[in-house]
Amino acid sequence: MPEPTMPDDLVRLWRLRNGPRLGRPAELDIDRVVDTAVRLADEGGLVAATLPKIAAALSVTPMSLYRHIGSKEELIGLMADAAMGPAPDCSSEATAEPNAHHATGGTATRGDATESASPAWRPALREWAVAQSEVFRRRPWLAQLPVTGPPRGPNAIAWMDAGLRALRETGLDWAAKIGVITVVGGYVRQAFTLDRQLAESRGAANVDERQALRRYVRELTAVVDAGRFPDVTALLGSGLFESVPDAPESADQDFAFGLDLVLDGVAAAVER
């Protein structure tokens, strides 16, 4: 029975050869196309990485790009894998010390106390999550890309392997491990997306986080009925929104708190 043919897009994603190369190397190749696309996206977001703009940056025609990337959809997958970069070393040996401070800019959080006495998987999985968050901060456009299936590219597979390696000693079965890294990765992506959208909204309104929250309290206090919404009324009158730290610190604290909640859920699954 003949072996199945490997899909062309997978060949390109893994930079595999379909036979020997003859003659001089081509002036344009898949790496140049993808590197240029990533650079343009880094500089101006996804709108800056269209095929015409990539072609212009490479001094070629847009149609010539299709010999190297297959389709616009395939280019997105190639960009995503390249932009994620190498995975971190999330083995228990590499994360023997608590790593919560990475997620909070050095600010102590509840994670600092819990990590010091936690099993090896917890700081390792935390480091994996924090590393993903740092990638999104460097390349916000990555969080805008659609999720079309499980990891396929070499970098994406390396990240998946690192997440699974963090959970190696937990005793969880494979389905549970995949579930854990999917939930943790989903939290990282959603937390970043929410924070960025709120920041963009405040920027459009020309207000900072403190001003936005004070306006929120003022406006909602005027319309929320205590009899109908007693707990929201109590929240609005608690003064919580009057003591918001600077935006970067606030976002870091929110991320660390949410990640702790997710990791607590993982711990409960591990201990069952």
Give residue spans per PLM region.
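Hydrophobic recognition helices of helix-based DNA-binding modules
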Residues: 79, 83, 87, 188-192, ...
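Alpha-helical structural segments
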Residues: 32-39, 43, 74-90, 123-131, ...
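A contiguous pocket-lining binding segment that forms or flanks enzyme active sites
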Residues: 162-211, 215-219
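Hydrophobic alpha-helical connector segments
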Residues: 90-158, 174-177, 181-184
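Short hydrophobic/aromatic patch on the recognition helix
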Residues: 59-69
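Basic, helix-initiating cap at the start of DNA-binding domains
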Residues: 1-53, 57, 70-74, 107
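C-terminal peripheral helix-coil segments that are non-catalytic and often amphipathic
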Residues: 1-17, 197-272
